[in-house]
Amino acid sequence: MAAPESLRPRLCRLVRGEQGYGFHLHGEKGRRGQFIRRVEPGSPAEAAALRAGDRLVEVNGVNVEGETHHQVVHRIKAVEGQTQLLVVDKETDEELCRRQLTCTEEMAHRGLPPAHNPWEPKPDWACSGSLGSDTGHKDVNGPPRELRPRLCHLRRGPQGYGFNLHSDKSRPGQYIRSVDPGSPASLSGLRAQDRLIEVNGQNVEGLRHAEVVARIKAQEDEARLLVVDPETDEHFKRLRVVPTEDHVEGPLPSPVTNGTSLAQLNGGSVCSSRSDLPGSEKDNEDGSAWKRDPFQESGLHLSPTAAEAKEKARATRVNKRAPQMDWNRKREIFSNF
């Protein structure tokens, strides 16, 4: 077994030959991600030091750990004649999972960071394994990992923060589309497919794309982003809890049974039905926020008074008007930082 200090990811640059790249990619049951199944002798893949059993982390600088087999193959073929693959062997993968480190291209050049190093990324969902309990992701070689949001501190570099933000028509919210290798975003632990929850301590789940961009740019040289990976996002939505900074290191929420609403423990907030209902109960066009019922947030669901019912009916009629499309929304499909 190799010493931990000698373990590192490998960046393999392949130039396509007459018979292709010369390797076979496949998924493994019970493990997240795509793996190198076979490398042909004398092929470009063998020359690039790709090995059977390697797990694929990035393709051409884009993290693919959460993508399907078809999506990964498409990314490999997207650049004609060549491709760049960031991979980890089994020992390195296990070490990264044990230390809860996010695999980055920077590690291929510098090696794994020592403990408590300032540039060490935050824990991520990269560890492969089978799903564990409601509160964790179980790795085949280790204990369950707690599903927590991640707080990423970014300090702007000469080329910006180094990530791309976009919205998805099929689901609400803002998502990290891609992260530039070696960028401030990459070093902070920000990953592709993360969903953005807070910017500089303020929840942005109900904001439009242009408004979120403005909040990120509000502080000139740094930003603090609270994000969740797809698995953590699904877990918190299942509990109907809004992730906050308290969940990064503090107590995690637990489901409450016997018909009681699912509440966040230890000072957090209950996830409002705003994220679960159609647009009639979202923010009005003039920017006024949907008013939360303090009793409902504490787990109580009271019948509305006659005045409240009348006000709700009036608001419903007003909200039936089709909102005007913000020209910024038309112009700015996604933004680079």
Swiss-Prot record:
Gene3D superfamilies: 2.30.42.10. Keywords: Cell membrane, Membrane, Nucleus, Phosphoprotein, Repeat. The modification Phosphoserine is found at S130, S183, S186, S254, S269, S280, S303. It comes from the Eukaryota. Residues 127-146, 246-337 are annotated as: Disordered. GO terms for cellular component: apical plasma membrane; cytoplasm; endomembrane system; nucleus; plasma membrane; protein-containing complex; stereocilium; stereocilium bundle. Residues 11-91, 151-231 form the PDZ domain. SUPFAM superfamilies: PDZ domain-like. Glomerular epithelium cell (podocyte) (at protein level). Detected in liver, bile duct, kidney glomerulus and lung. Residues 135-146, 327-337 have a biased composition (Basic and acidic residues). It is found in: Endomembrane system; Nucleus; Apical cell membrane. GO terms for molecular function: beta-catenin binding; identical protein binding; low-density lipoprotein particle receptor binding; molecular adaptor activity; phosphatase binding; protein-membrane adaptor activity; signaling receptor binding. One of its GO terms (biological process) is sensory perception of sound. The keyword Repeat applies. It is a peripheral membrane protein. Residues 255-275 have a biased composition (Polar residues). InterPro entries: EBP50_C, NHER, NHERF-1/NHERF-2, PDZ, PDZ_sf. Scaffold protein that connects plasma membrane proteins with members of the ezrin/moesin/radixin family and thereby helps to link them to the actin cytoskeleton and to regulate their surface expression. Necessary for cAMP-mediated phosphorylation and inhibition of SLC9A3. May also act as scaffold protein in the nucleus. Homodimer, and heterodimer with NHERF1. Binds ADRB2, SLC9A3, P2RY1, P2YR2, SRY, RDX, PDZK1 and LPAR2. Found in a complex with EZR, PODXL and NHERF2. Interacts (via the PDZ domains) with PODXL (via the C-terminal PDZ-binding motif DTHL); interaction is detected in glomerular epithelium cells. Interacts with SGK1 and KCNJ1/ROMK1. Interacts (via the PDZ domains) with SLC26A6. This is Na(+)/H(+) exchange regulatory cofactor NHE-RF2.
